[in-house]
């Protein structure tokens, strides 16, 4: 308990909580928009697919921009875009294609701003960014519930504006050194013996699997609003615990905990809520691990590193829009195989727990040679 208390009192941990609220409100706004829009649309399945593509994929590019211009408080621009999208769609009845573009870019900006702020102010710890990311899960279900009730647009806009003081307060934690390229050099979680390019590919693959399983996990028990709320709450708790426990007991232990122990609960929890929720919580922990690995490889580009995780989430969730596996035996087989593969990958690409003295690869100019995206 003393170690847990120590982690929860880590330097600048408040930044994680501040951006958890900002992330929560961001997802409330986005899923309020999506739920309202899809309820009135004849192309209901297209809109979430378009949203996922536009909200997830560009985050790497925006992240790279923020890496270059780290002093720019881009989150305030994101708030303005989210508010504009809501007013365009539900106040001015504009074309949804235009408003969803504005909404998604605003969403991208808010995510990248949170990642940049929590990573740069964490001194190599994972709890800060894990707490920030966890806030979004609570926002998803809250936004859906608000869209199903009678809530005036002005109240939703007011909720959006409450993010501004939190953004300004989070920004006060920045010191001059946190804006520099060296801010994330304390992230040393990746295996130094494996090529950085290969680590990025493998870590992104693990994120793809997590993205798929987030939609593909059999949860036939999930029939009521209360059960849906519990599912998203447990997802959020799992994401936060992944970072907190990694700082407490070590990232390799959490890697095994979050993948191997999740298997029986995910496989046999289809009709039993509590068993399923335990599995969901365990596997959600991998978020912090993969982010920590990617930032270790790209310490001078934390925004870009975060972007790889969101691209992975999109690639993992996209197949669900086109193919749905009905046979639970096939689903369970996939869960077992993919979980074991992810365990093997994580243990290979993670560095040794006590090998923190050396850096992995601090001259990351190799990146443009692989991806041709070091464009600024």
Question: Model features per residue range: what roles?
Answer:
Residues 125-147, 306-322:
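Glycine-rich segments within core transmembrane alpha-helices of 12-TM secondary carriers
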Residues 153-172, 331-349:
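Symmetry-related core transmembrane helices of the 12-TM Major Facilitator Superfamily/SLC fold
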Residues 253-289:
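C-terminal transmembrane helical hairpin of 12-TM major facilitator-type secondary transporters
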Residues 6-52, 209-219:
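Helix-loop boundary and gating motifs at the non-cytosolic
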